[in-house]
């Protein structure tokens, strides 16, 4: 999936994965009780931040990676009818392989 959003510095555009709709026992979870997703797919990355010496610091993630991110990190945006999350690289906790 390609998105026409180009993040700046060390920011990352993530498409959150859908939250679970049912429990393991088959109970349907209403929207009001669902947890905010913390996993998503990286759709775009910025060029990286510039350190104190003027060197560009590359990001640890690449487009297509599945990541786990901080529960309350990032900014939710809606673009072209889709919902995305723009995160700082520091909000990404792990890459899922």
Swiss-Prot record:
Primary location group: cytoplasm
Recorded coiled-coil stretches: none
Protein name, per record: Co-chaperonin GroES
Species lineage: Bacteria, Bacillati, Actinomycetota, Actinomycetes, Propionibacteriales
Tree of life domain: Bacteria
Family: Belongs to the GroES chaperonin family.
Family annotation (Pfam families): Cpn10 (PF00166)
Record GO biological process: chaperone cofactor-dependent protein refolding
Gene for this chain: groES
GO molecular function: ATP binding; metal ion binding; protein folding chaperone; protein-folding chaperone binding; unfolded protein binding
Known function: Together with the chaperonin GroEL, plays an essential role in assisting protein folding. The GroEL-GroES system forms a nano-cage that allows encapsulation of the non-native substrate proteins and provides a physical environment optimized to promote and accelerate protein folding. GroES binds to the apical surface of the GroEL ring, thereby capping the opening of the GroEL channel.
Keyword annotations: Chaperone, Cytoplasm
Subunit structure: Heptamer of 7 subunits arranged in a ring. Interacts with the chaperonin GroEL.
Family annotation (InterPro entries): Chaperonin_GroES (IPR020818), Chaperonin_GroES_sf (IPR037124), Chaprnonin_Cpn10_CS (IPR018369), GroES-like_sf (IPR011032)
Location relative to the cell: Cytoplasm
Cellular component GO terms held in the UniProt record: cytoplasm
């Amino acid at each position: 999936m390609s998105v026409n959003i180009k993040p700046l510095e060390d920011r990352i555009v993530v498409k959150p994965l859908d939250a679970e709709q049912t429990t393991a026992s088959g109970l349907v979870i209403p929207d009001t009780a669902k947890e905010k997703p913390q996993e998503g797919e990286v759709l775009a990355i910025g060029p990286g931040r510039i350190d104190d010496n003027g060197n560009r610091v590359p990001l640890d993630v690449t487009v297509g990676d599945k990541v786990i991110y901080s529960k309350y990190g990032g900014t939710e945006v809606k673009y072209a009818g889709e919902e995305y999350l723009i995160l700082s690289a520091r909000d990404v906790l792990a890459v899922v392989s």
